[in-house]
Design a protein with these regions (language model features):
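Short, Lys/Arg-enriched N-terminal segments with co-localized hydrophobic residues
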Residues: 1-16
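Soluble "head" domains of membrane/secretory-pathway proteins
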Residues: 12-24, 39, 43-49, 56-201
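Generic secretory/membrane-interface signal
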Residues: 2-4, 35, 124
Length: 201
């Protein structure tokens, strides 16, 4: 009878060990997935829901989009330490995600209109760069802006950005600084995945 009890105990112990091994295997899988998702979200992608109409008709209120963090290089806050490596700079007409200059806890999404060192003028609903008589071609805007702005010279390390919905956008025309610095740019808007898939440009 002693050997029977001992045998039962061994079987029970093996069973418990097997169950714990399976639980640990699942736990490891979950940990790995969480780490990968966290790394992708913090290093590669920006996952955002659009809260306002400022980029209509290109991006609508409620759209869910991915931004690509590595489009211009690496700009990462790693446990309070900033890691930054620039590969390329934003170009005119790029739609960028950035820290709002007047409150860096907020992130904004707008279109790059003027580049570092350029002078921008918004007059009679059109945008002019560096005193050109020819206005920018902007087929993406919802409607022409009612108010004039400028001329304004963008600082050396800055970008002048506006929303596509020109009359309903809190953008560089309204801000205290009137520009986004290169270091505040987090990434480039990539594609919308909800309510339908669309490449953003």
């Amino acid at each position: 009878s002693f050997s029977v009890k001992s045998s039962k105990r061994k079987i029970l112990r093996r069973l418990i060990m097997r169950i714990w091994k399976e639980i640990w295997d699942y736990a490891k899988m979950i940990i790995i997935v969480v780490v990968i998702v966290t790394l992708v979200n913090s290093v590669v992608l920006i996952n955002a829901k659009i809260p306002s109409e400022s980029m209509e008709k290109t991006i609508m209120t409620g759209d869910r989009i991915f931004g690509f963090r590595l489009a211009y290089g690496l700009n990462l806050d790693f446990f309070g330490h900033e890691i930054s490596k620039k590969i390329k700079d934003p170009e005119r007409f790029d739609i960028v995600i950035f820290k709002y200059p007047d409150d860096e806890t907020e992130w904004f999404i707008k279109r790059v209109i003027a580049l570092p060192g350029e002078t921008v003028l918004v007059k009679d609903g059109k945008v002019y760069i560096n005193g050109s008589k020819k206005a920018l071609s902007e087929p993406y805007i919802k409607e022409e802006p009612v108010e004039d702005f400028g001329p304004y010279k963008v600082p050396k390390n800055g970008y002048f950005v506006m929303g596509d919905n020109r009359n309903n956008s809190n953008d560089a025309r309204e801000w205290e600084t009137h520009y986004v610095s290169r270091d505040e740019v987090l990434g480039k808007a990539w594609f919308r995945y909800y309510p339908s898939i669309k490449v953003i440009k």
